[in-house]
Amino acid sequence: QVGMIHTAMNEFGKQHDGYSQAPMSVCSAMSQGYIGYDLQNGIRAELIKRGIYKPVSTVLTQVTVDPYDEAFYTPVKVIGRVMTKEEADAEEAKGNHVTEVEGGYRRIVASPHPVAIVEIDAIKALMDADQIVIACGGGGIPVMEQGYNLRGASAIIEKDLATGLLA
């Protein structure tokens, strides 16, 4: 989903002046939001249908990663659509990594290990309040600490690793 959103946002930006391309971390947040929204409403409806009245909450979840994680030097996570050789060359010219796949080329990004879940206290508070919590969607929004700020990382965190950290 993130690759699809990233491609769509960037294609739109290319075709319309005044619109900038969306960073990978923003696309991760969009993916988390729309999937979380659908899950939250689906779970809520099913609970009500069964006579269970329990709040369901989706938490946009940022997950810190180490900026020196080896994964940033050897990207392997395939995202986006299949491209032609010319499109792949253009991606590489922009500083992105691509790999050859059946039928063409695809973009690859880093898949660093998750370090910490930024919103863990909010997630725990919602669970303590007996809510059903949807968190770490898509592996979380990868961020790096930069002073007092969090900066989005151009990466995708493996869902299993983020969920393991959440557990």
Indicate residue ranges for each PLM-predicted region.
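A sequence-level detector of short, solvent-exposed, charge-rich linear segments
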Residues: 24, 77, 141-146, 153
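A short secondary-structure junction signal
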Residues: 69-72, 144-148
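Short secondary-structure transition/capping segments
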Residues: 6-8, 147
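Generic, ordered loop/turn and secondary-structure boundary motif
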Residues: 106-110, 118-119, 142-145, 151, ...
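Ligand-binding beta-strand-loop-alpha-helix segment within the catalytic cores
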Residues: 10-133
